[in-house]
């Protein structure tokens, strides 16, 4: 007699991203209480399981939801506000002045817009570092994605705190509010070496240990950052942070562009994870992170979009394409960054960066964080190697279904938890606010 389950999801092709990287033709997934109960051939699943709901995606490819290992979701409101500038000019001359006027309502609005974009392009979980992260998590709670959120901690006031001394209590309070949430988690997020002091970084380390939280930090993003760190602290960013005890297996470092071979060895030895953000690094001309060298040392890399103000999208499919092509031409080696490795970064690697067990793969016992892509799209046919299509052909807009914890959040153009038209009306109002902030900063 068939076993009961909540949902049976069927499709022409399933890319599991399990340890064997199994691909199943004419497959199905049994989902119960938010987790995958079984995955296999359609006939076997339908014969062994009885679903209350059956969703037949037909000529679609089912795969794990993508994981954005580093972003600033609310910066969707600043998309296109300032472009074609070096990182520090972009930050200090344009972004920071506008961010001074942020409110919780604006952060929540921008984060919800970011969630909508991610759901529309197949992302089910993301690691966020920004301001007023309680507001980001309210948007996450509304939209239904998973999120590891870190309040950016600076050596100066932010819209979330007037005194940096209070930032640590703020993070404690955020942790207390969200620690039992099924899809949200907290990280300790010192913004960067150049916006912190040794004392603040040490307190971030201690707070992470106290609360059992991971650390999320921008590091070694540019040569300018390195030069400044040497001038102020007498060391390059990686050894400087290592001396402060920040580099552990619970640490995810965003960017890691300006690294020496010895620093790559040190990061590998410490077991840190790196969030590689190729499109943002290219757009800001920050450089090319030595991703292939890090992978060669056995390091785990996730893939991140960075914020929509420096990318300018949160689309993980286009990020995969850029990642693969960038490293091939950089090394003049077409075997660099193969599709399978890049797909791993966007799924399993991202799951590792978020410290969320079981996401980024489709296998029994794992959370049912699943997306389905339309194989009827002209750019998706004919299909020989699914990983190749996902990295080199898919654009993200083939996404038909996005599911988190067995719950359908997006299906064929419709969001199930919020009204997109209402959201866009509020976003248009926020554009007016942003332009006023720009004029006031001049």
Curated annotation (Swiss-Prot):
Catalytic activity: S-adenosyl-L-homocysteine + H2O + H(+) = S-inosyl-L-homocysteine + NH4(+); S-methyl-5'-thioadenosine + H2O + H(+) = S-methyl-5'-thioinosine + NH4(+)
Name under which the protein is recorded: 5-methylthioadenosine/S-adenosylhomocysteine deaminase
Tree of life domain: Bacteria
HAMAP family hit by this protein: MTA_SAH_deamin
Chain residues that bind substrate: 99, 191, 221, 306
Cofactors: Zn(2+)
Record bears the keyword Isomerase: no
Family assignment from sequence similarity: Belongs to the metallo-dependent hydrolases superfamily. MTA/SAH deaminase family.
One Pfam family per UniProt: Amidohydro_1
């Amino acid at each position: 007699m068939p076993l009961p389950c909540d949902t049976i999801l069927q499709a022409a092709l399933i890319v599991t991203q399990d340890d064997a990287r199994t691909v199943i033709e004419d497959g199905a997934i049994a989902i119960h209480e938010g987790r995958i109960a079984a995955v296999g051939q359609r006939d076997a699943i339908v014969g062994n399981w009885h679903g209350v709901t059956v969703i037949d995606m037909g000529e679609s490819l089912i795969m794990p939801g993508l994981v954005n290992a580093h972003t600033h979701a609310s910066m969707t409101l600043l998309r296109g506000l300032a472009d074609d500038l070096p990182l520090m000019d972009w930050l200090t001359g344009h972004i920071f002045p506008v961010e001074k006027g942020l409110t919780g309502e604006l952060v929540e609005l921008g984060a919800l817009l970011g969630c909508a974009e991610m759901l529309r392009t197949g992302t089910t979980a993301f690691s966020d570092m920004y301001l007023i992260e309680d507001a980001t998590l309210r948007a996450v709670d509304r939209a239904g994605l998973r999120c590891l959120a870190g309040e950016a901690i600076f050596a100066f006031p932010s819209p979330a705190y007037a005194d940096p001394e209070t930032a640590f209590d703020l993070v404690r309070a955020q942790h207390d509010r969200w620690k039992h949430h099924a899809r949200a988690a907290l990280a300790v997020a010192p913004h960067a070496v150049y916006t912190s002091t040794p004392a603040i970084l040490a307190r971030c380390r201690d707070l992470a240990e106290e609360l059992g939280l991971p650390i999320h930090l921008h590091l070694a993003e540019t040569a300018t950052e390195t030069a400044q760190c040497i001038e102020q602290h007498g060391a390059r960013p990686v050894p400087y942070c290592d001396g402060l005890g920040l580099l552990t297996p619970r640490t995810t470092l965003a960017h890691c562009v300006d690294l020496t071979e010895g620093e790559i060895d040190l990061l590998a030895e410490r077991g840190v994870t790196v969030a590689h953000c190729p499109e943002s690094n290219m757009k800001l001309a920050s450089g090319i992170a030595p991703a292939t060298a890090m992978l060669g040392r056995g390091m785990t890399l996730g893939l991140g979009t960075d914020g929509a103000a420096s990318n300018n999208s949160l689309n993980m499919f286009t990020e995969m394409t850029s990642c693969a092509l960038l490293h091939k031409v950089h090394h003049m080696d077409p075997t660099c960054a193969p599709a399978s490795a890049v797909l791993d970064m966007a799924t399993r690697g991202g799951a590792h960066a978020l410290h969320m067990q079981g996401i980024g793969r489709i296998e029994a016992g794992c959370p049912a964080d699943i997306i389905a892509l339309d194989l009827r799209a002209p750019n998706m046919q004919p299909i020989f190697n699914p990983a190749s299509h996902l990295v080199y052909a898919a654009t993200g807009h083939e996404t038909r279904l996005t599911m988190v914890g067995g719950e359908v959040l997006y299906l064929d153009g419709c969001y199930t938890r919020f009204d997109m038209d209402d959201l866009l009306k509020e976003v248009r109002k926020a554009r007016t606010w942003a332009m006023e902030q720009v004029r006031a900063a001049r």
